[in-house]
Amino acid sequence: NLFKCIDADRTKVILLGDRFQLAAVGPGSFFADVSDLKGPLADNISHLTKSWRFDASKALGKIAEASREGEELIVTDAFVENSDNDPRVDNPLRLHEDAPKGDLSASFKKWFENELSSPLKVIAELRRNRTEKSLHDAAHELARLYFSVGVLASNREGPMSAQAVNAFAESIFVKEGIPYPAFRPMIVRRNDSMLEVYNGVIGVVMPGQSWFEGAEFDATQANVYFPDSARLVRFGLIGHIEPAFAITIHQSQGSEYHHVAVLMPQDPNSGLATRELFYTAVTRVRDERNGKQTTYGSLDVFGKLTVVKKALRTPVQRQGGLIRRIVEAKDRMQKTRR
């Protein structure tokens, strides 16, 4: 629909993206097709090689390139060589192969509880001294902590899934006596142009202003703080919203985090273990730069090495007919010019 609205004689269109990431849900692989360096649009393609998210010469850069090319040995060696690196020197890369006991593995629960400890400390301090804090300052601090960590799952439901992680997080919040939905990260699941909130946007639920003035928590007064726009939107007005302590790898595209946990499929033959899925997940990691000092991001992969290897040697094969249609369109244009 977008291209139908464009005046081709007066408009130049630039498409920017990563052809090696997961394609959108649905048939075909639009961006991979149009950006194929051997395809019919090759003369119109510029291949960008410098990464601004992480250092290509460090461990993460090497594992990203190797996963893109399906180089199993380089990826597996990287996990062994960089398991205990100082984050000021290089990217820590860790592989946790223990099987889930119930919905989640013991190693993941330990990792997650450690990462959740910082937001919980901020929440505890807020609950003790809420009248001394401003709503926006508190929301900004919580968002900063939540959005520095990405828990990215291959599966939406089942063992080692986004749903399992969100349920585990909720059990921790209940144990801490934190009323729902206060202080939880939430993801919007449907566009709402009236509220100007859109599918995939994540915010943090904050109590209403009265809570910061000493009143009891009132869920009807809760707001969702969206850090990208620094806006507060009433929680009850957003019809389709759900917890986002963990999201799927598909949902994470376009996002970046200083620490990333990847929950791989349990079954190597499920069809989810693909090269594009693994590459998309590992390239969500970002380094943090403060002047001349760089703190390198970390990657923890939870799953069997056999599943990682299966993913690396399984590129997605999708046929949508777009290449054929582009070739036909070019042929028609050339005949018209003659």
Regions found by a protein language model. Name each.
Residues 3, 35, 49, 166, ...:
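Generic hydrophobic alpha-helical scaffold/packing signal
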Residues 170-177, 190, 243-249, 271:
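Short alpha-helix capping/helix-loop boundary micro-motifs
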Residues 13, 24, 199, 250:
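Short glycine- and Lys/Arg-enriched binding-loop motifs that mark or flank ligand-binding interfaces
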Residues 201-338:
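C-terminal accessory regions
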Residues 179-184, 198, 252, 258:
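Residue-level recognition of short, solvent-exposed, well-ordered loop/turn junctions
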Residues 5-11, 19-186, 192-195, 333-338:
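Conserved helicase motor core of P-loop NTPases
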Residues 14, 44-49, 152, 261, ...:
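Hydrophobic/aromatic beta-strand patches that form the interior of the parallel beta-sheet core
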